[in-house]
């Protein structure tokens, strides 16, 4: 039976040393599921509420004991004897129990921990890996996603002078996920050597990418191209580039303030800036190219380069189906970043992915800068045919854990394993 017998939560630490919530669900048949909730550094203003204690004498106010108490009290009592196999019904019960639009009463971190742990428990009860169980919910084919490997960190993810938050390599020319992972790793090694050769720091940021100071943002791209070539790969063929601009972080009074470039640009000027980069470099994906409230700027960018580049809404859409629909209806962006803690339940996460695919938008399953050893997002990416995953660089075990889970899934699929590769960008004409 998949009836819930017990729910338990605790406070643990994430990869930045901040408290986060971990939940466990035990079923009547003894099956057990556990999930830990991630946390972001650069966050959209419309994200579901991550409930923090606010007690400055404890973890500088970042404790999550209130959220833990909500799980161990109200949520555990309400869901006892509920059938965890009814994921949609369980998540609806959680949403109704919270009763707020932004999940601010009980906390999205409380709801999400239980939602994900319940799915793990049902998968265990059915003696299925999580990805296989989730694929029965989504009724999707399965595929190994293209990893978007964040090898240079900037912005809110690093203490350097780089304005843009992430510079990524995408090994689209490989024949399997394992080969793609090898390519990314070899480029990461090569980049370290190149940075040392230029006398630059090889310290890493929150997501495991290198975080040196550069003379300009574009120097980061040039350095990555050098590393790709040194590793024996061809940029534009084997490897494409991706950016997370995270422009809401430097958008102020209607201008984009690029400290590293000593420029303050209007939306039109910043669109020109990004379009010039697209013309000069093998960039296939730009995330949060414009600020979350600059819908007019987003439309300009979409009209300018949207046929040639994947334009990903993260802060713009915050994995929220209601907000995402506005983007679809207005033809804004052409892809959505999927972060489970932005919306707060598994069901709503899967709904956002399904909505993207129905509208011919790409979906990218993503980690947060504050992560744990939890690997749930790897299974979600495979089970939904998301075709792309963002889970950081090639160091820090909180990032590598997801890559290792994808290796396990690829091995389990055997001859049925399919790597998305270039097919992930079939609608993009470069």
UniProtKB/Swiss-Prot annotation:
Gene3D superfamilies noted in UniProt: Enolase-like C-terminal domain, Enolase-like, N-terminal domain
Cofactor(s) essential for the protein: Mg(2+)
Binding locations of Mg(2+): 244, 287, 314
Residues at the catalytic site: 207, 339
Catalytic reaction(s) noted: (2R)-2-phosphoglycerate = phosphoenolpyruvate + H2O
Tree of life domain: Bacteria
Subcellular compartments: Cytoplasm; Secreted; Cell surface
Residue sites binding (2R)-2-phosphoglycerate per the record: 165, 339, 368-369, 390
Keyword Magnesium: yes
Pfam families: Enolase_C, Enolase_N
Lineage of source species: Bacteria, Pseudomonadati, Pseudomonadota, Gammaproteobacteria, Lysobacterales
GO-annotated biological processes: glycolytic process
Protein name as it appears in the record: Enolase
EC number annotated for this UniProt entry: 4.2.1.11
Homology family: Belongs to the enolase family.
Molecular function, one GO term: phosphopyruvate hydratase activity
Associated pathway: Carbohydrate degradation; glycolysis; pyruvate from D-glyceraldehyde 3-phosphate: step 4/5
Subunit structure and binding partners: Component of the RNA degradosome, a multiprotein complex involved in RNA processing and mRNA degradation.
Co-factor note (free text): Binds a second Mg(2+) ion via substrate during catalysis.
Stated role: Catalyzes the reversible conversion of 2-phosphoglycerate (2-PG) into phosphoenolpyruvate (PEP). It is essential for the degradation of carbohydrates via glycolysis.
Xref: PANTHER family: ENOLASE
UniProt xrefs under InterPro entries: Enolase, Enolase-like_C_sf, Enolase-like_N, Enolase_C, Enolase_CS, Enolase_N
SMART domains to which the protein is assigned, alphabetical: Enolase_C (SM01192), Enolase_N (SM01193)
């Amino acid at each position: 039976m998949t009836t819930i017998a017990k729910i338990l939560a605790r406070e643990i630490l994430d990869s930045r040393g901040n408290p986060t919530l971990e939940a466990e669900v035990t079923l009547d048949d003894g099956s057990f599921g556990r999930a830990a909730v991630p946390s972001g550094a650069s966050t959209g203003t419309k994200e579901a509420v991550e409930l923090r204690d606010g007690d400055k004498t404890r973890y500088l106010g970042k404790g999550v004991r209130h959220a833990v108490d909500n799980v161990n009290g109200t949520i555990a009592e309400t869901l006892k004897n509920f059938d965890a196999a009814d994921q949609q019904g369980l998540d609806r019960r959680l949403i109704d129990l919270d009763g707020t639009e932004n999940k601010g009463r009980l906390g999205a971190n409380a709801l999400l921990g239980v939602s994900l742990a319940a799915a793990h428990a049902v998968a265990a009860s059915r003696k299925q890996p999580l990805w296989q169980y989730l694929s029965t919910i989504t009724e999707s084919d399965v595929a190994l996603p293209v990893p978007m490997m964040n090898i240079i960190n900037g912005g809110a993810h690093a203490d350097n002078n780089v304005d843009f938050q992430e510079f990524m390599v995408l090994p689209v020319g490989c024949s399997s996920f394992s080969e793609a992972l090898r390519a990314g790793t070899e480029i990461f090694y090569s980049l370290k050597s190149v940075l040392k050769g230029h006398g630059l720091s090889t310290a890493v940021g929150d997501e495991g990418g290198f975080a040196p100071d550069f003379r300009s943002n574009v120097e980061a791209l040039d350095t990555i191209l050098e590393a790709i070539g040194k590793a024996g790969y061809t940029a534009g063929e084997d490897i494409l580039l991706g950016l997370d601009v995270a422009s809401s972080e430097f958008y102020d009074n209607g201008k984009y303030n690029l400290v590293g470039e000593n420029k303050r640009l209007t939306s039109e000027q910043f669109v020109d800036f990004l379009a010039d980069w697209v013309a000069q470099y093998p960039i296939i994906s730009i995330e949060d190219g414009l600020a979350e409230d600059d819908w007019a700027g987003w439309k300009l960018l979409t009209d300018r380069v949207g046929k040639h580049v994947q334009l990903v809404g993260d802060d713009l859409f915050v994995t929220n189906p209601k907000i995402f629909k506005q983007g679809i209806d207005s033809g804004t962006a052409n892809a959505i970043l999927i972060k489970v803690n932005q919306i707060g339940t598994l069901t709503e996460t899967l709904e956002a992915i399904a909505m993207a695919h129905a509208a011919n938008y790409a979906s990218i399953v993503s980690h947060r800068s504050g992560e744990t050893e939890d690997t749930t997002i790897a299974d979600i990416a495979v089970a939904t045919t998301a075709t792309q995953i963002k889970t950081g660089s090639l160091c820090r075990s909180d990032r590598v854990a997801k890559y290792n889970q994808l290796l396990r899934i690829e091995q389990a699929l055997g001859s049925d394993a399919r790597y998305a590769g270039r097919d992930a960008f079939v609608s993009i004409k470069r």
